[in-house]
Structure formats: C-alpha cells, structure tokens
Amino acid sequence: MNDGFNDDKGRSVIKANDTQTGNLIINGYNGVWGTDHDDGSQFQNDAGNFFIFGGCKNYLGNHKQCVDNVILYPGTSGRSAGGHRCQTDDNGVFAEQFYVGNTCATEDGRILDFSGCNPTNVNTTAYRTAMNTYFVDSSSTLQGPCESGTWAEWQALGQDIGSIVALTPSVATLISLGAAKVLGD
C-alpha cells in the first residue's frame, strides 16, 4: 500500500494499524482498564473482543478505535476500575477516534467518560460514537458524557446516532453475546 510516505522499497514512516481482536479480556480486581492506549499511542484498534469489568481507554494520541466489542460492567464501584466506563478518555484531544458498534452493560447508567469533552465543540473533544447498544438496569438512568446531562442531550450533539438503550438481559444472555464475539458470530 502506498500512503504517500513510502520510500523506493515500499516502506513507510506511517505506522500500520495494530488491531487487538477476538480476545477475552477479564479485568482483575486491581486492574483499571481493559485496554489502555496511552501516552501518544496511535493506530490502535480494539475490535471484536469480549471485555469483563473493563472497557477501552485512551490518553493522548490519535487514530484509535473501539469497535464491535461486548463490554460488561466496566466502572463497577468498589473495584479499582470504579468510574471508568465503556470508553474512557482522559485528555479531550481527538483525531480520528471512534467508539462504534459496541454492546455495553453498566451497573449505573454511566456509559462514557470523556473528561475533556466540551459540548460546544463535541466533535473535536470527544470520540465519535454511533450504532452502539447500551444495557442499563431498570433502576438506572442513562447519563450522557460531556456535561450534556441526559441521553437525549448527548444525541442532540450528534453523538451516538443509531445507538439504542435497552434493559439489561440475563447474565446468560450477556455471556452468550460475548462468547459469540470471540468465537465467531
């Protein structure tokens, strides 16, 4: 592939995508994130994985995707990962970063954590989100990130278009969704 930065032997200075796929990732008791792409990393894709007690995380860098994963109970209180969500970002600077097509179940209705997100320029301070399925318990109210307050306000910012919210199914159903992801649909 010629990306415009190739030498005469076809080598490029642009890093190739690094994709983590088909994995069962169980975040241990003292773990914080399921995956942690930090400190300026780029071209990272977490796709088609099954996460338990942790989700995707970014700090600095660009060109990252968390797509087509099943994520169960990230951010569970009382664990080291408490407060960290389906997708967490700690810096609010984005270029080509996406959280799309995931299925995530939470215990409290908090789904995304974008600490630097600003609703007046959401497209440059938050991951692009779309076509996700969020499961919440009947006692929870889904909360939007980015100081947007409600889910409806988050979607009004152009985020999570095509995403749905549903009541959490049985644990057996959640496990079967994750198993299908890593074993093949």
Annotated model-derived regions:
Residues M1-G184:
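Glycine- and acidic/polar-rich repeat regions and solenoidal domains
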